[in-house]
């Protein structure tokens, strides 16, 4: 056992606040970090301690400064770091730096982050686990000719994907040979900018697909469970905007097979801590295919928490300290005892202008009135009257999660809740 007594969250806004809450309930002292541009952000005031990182004028780089964050953690007696999502959450160098400093990284081990960070290596892992994968290139393409050859073998349409990325960036759908050159150059450029690597690979594109993902949780002793599935098919620009749990109108046999496939991948990888295995389900054939594993907490983890009653972040902190899933504090020793009750739905209130191609908006919120009521959960960042929304970070303002006995009831809760919101000063 390696107890965590003081936890630094290497992140900002709503996910930092979310982690602080679970840590506080476990009696763990919390530490926030904030960039100069985030000096008025709410998350810094929700922790027991808060420290400035980086330099003025470098807001993103401040949260990516591995050496600076680890040095700060050591200087202030931190013995655990939770990376949240985004930023350094999937960076094996960060996890390695934490380990070298004697700090527990709340997430998978370094080798696993390295494997899962390479989408082609992750495809190989799924194949070894006996899980179906989409037809595609076994490794990144080396140029236009290589991409064209593979695309012709697969048949149009195909999709180009960043080999070392995610979040919808570095992805392009190509419906014919005349589109390939421009799409390849664009995907490689975006991938290089976002992930530091221009490597992309080619997959067959499923035109009518559902995006289904399974929540996993593993301990350091080889035990692994799933917490059922989520449907994340409602997307914009390959990025999720609405998530549901459980997936509605999914054939029970398909649901069971997908959850079993996720467990098979997790066991093959010897997965530990929280992670999500993502699949595409062909709406025409009912067949499903592995996409990737996200080795971190997900934005949409709240819908799973609502239908299972399980605090996933709390379990992350416990298993990182060495607790077994079967320990009373964790309470997940028996897969059959984990139940899904009711339905949950999440949507995101963002500071984007719907009349201007959803471009991010920023400025001072002159008014903010949130909503609540039966079946509603709000996970907010810097959301209050007078708050300043800066142009430097993600536009997410509040995650709204609704729970009901059915999806229809949850949808009714969330519609009423969104109508109650009043936000002025920035477009939403």
Give the predicted meaning of each segment.
Residues 38-42, 58-60, 88, 111-115, ...:
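Short gly/pro/ser/thr-enriched loop/turn and capping motifs at secondary-structure boundaries
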Residues 99, 103-163, 170:
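A conserved helix-loop-beta module that forms one wall/lid of the active-site cleft
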Residues 33-35, 52-99:
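N-terminal glycine-rich "phosphate-gripper" loop used for MgATP/nucleotide binding
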Residues 49, 80, 158:
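Short, Asp-centered acidic motifs that coordinate Mg2+ and/or phosphate
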Residues 3, 65-68, 146:
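Well-ordered alpha-helical segments embedded in enzymatic catalytic cores
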Residues 33-49, 90-91, 119-122:
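Short, glycine/polar-rich helix-capping loops at beta-to-alpha or helix-loop-helix junctions
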Residues 2-36, 50-52, 74-76, 92, ...:
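ATP-dependent carboxylate activation and anion-phosphoryl transfer catalytic cores
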């Amino acid at each position: 056992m390696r107890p965590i007594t003081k936890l630094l969250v290497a992140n900002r806004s709503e996910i930092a606040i979310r982690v602080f809450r679970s840590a506080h309930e476990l009696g763990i002292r919390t530490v926030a970090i904030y960039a100069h541009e985030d000096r008025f952000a709410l998350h810094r005031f929700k922790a027991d301690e808060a420290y400035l990182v980086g330099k003025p004028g470098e807001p993103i780089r401040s949260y990516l400064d591995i050496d600076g964050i680890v040095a700060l953690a050591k200087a202030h007696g931190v013995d655990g770091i939770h990376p949240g999502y985004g930023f350094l959450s999937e960076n094996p160098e960060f996890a390695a730096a934490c380990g070298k400093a004697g700090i527990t990284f709340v997430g998978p081990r370094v080798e696993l982050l390295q494997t899962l960070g390479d989408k082609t290596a992750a495809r190989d892992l799924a194949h070894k686990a006996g899980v179906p994968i989409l037809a595609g290139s076994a490794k990144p393409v080396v140029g236009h000719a290589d991409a064209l050859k593979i695309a012709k073998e697969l048949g149009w349409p195909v999709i180009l994907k960043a080999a070392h990325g995610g979040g919808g960036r570095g992805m392009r759908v190509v419906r014919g040979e005349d589109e390939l050159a421009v799409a390849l150059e664009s995907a490689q450029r975006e991938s290089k900018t976002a992930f530091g690597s221009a490597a992309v690979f080619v997959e067959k594109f499923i035109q009518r697909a559902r995006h289904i993902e399974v929540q996993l949780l593993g301990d350091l002793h080889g035990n692994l469970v799933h917490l059922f599935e989520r449907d994340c098919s409602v997307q914009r620009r390959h990025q999720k905007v609405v998530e549901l749990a459980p997936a509605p109108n999914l054939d029970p046999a398909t649901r069971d097979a997908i959850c079993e496939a996720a467990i098979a991948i997790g066991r093959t990888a010897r997965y530990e801590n929280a992670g999500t295995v993502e699949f595409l389900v062909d709406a025409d054939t009912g067949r499903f295919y592995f996409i990737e594993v996200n080795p971190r907490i997900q934005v949409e983890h709240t819908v799973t928490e609502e239908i299972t009653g399980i605090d996933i972040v709390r379990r992350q902190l416990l298993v990182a300290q060495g607790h077994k899933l079967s320990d009373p504090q964790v309470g997940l020793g028996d897969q059959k005892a984990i139940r899904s009750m009711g339905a949950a739905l999440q949507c995101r209130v963002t500071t984007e202008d719907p009349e201007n191609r959803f471009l991010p908006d920023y400025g001072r919120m002159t008014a903010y009135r949130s909503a609540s009521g039966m079946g509603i959960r709000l996970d907010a960042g810097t959301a209050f009257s007078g708050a300043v929304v800066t142009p430097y970070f993600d536009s997410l303002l509040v995650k709204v999660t609704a729970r009901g006995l059915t999806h229809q009831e949850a949808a009714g809760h969330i519609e009423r809740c969104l109508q109650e919101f009043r936000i002025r000063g920035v477009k939403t």
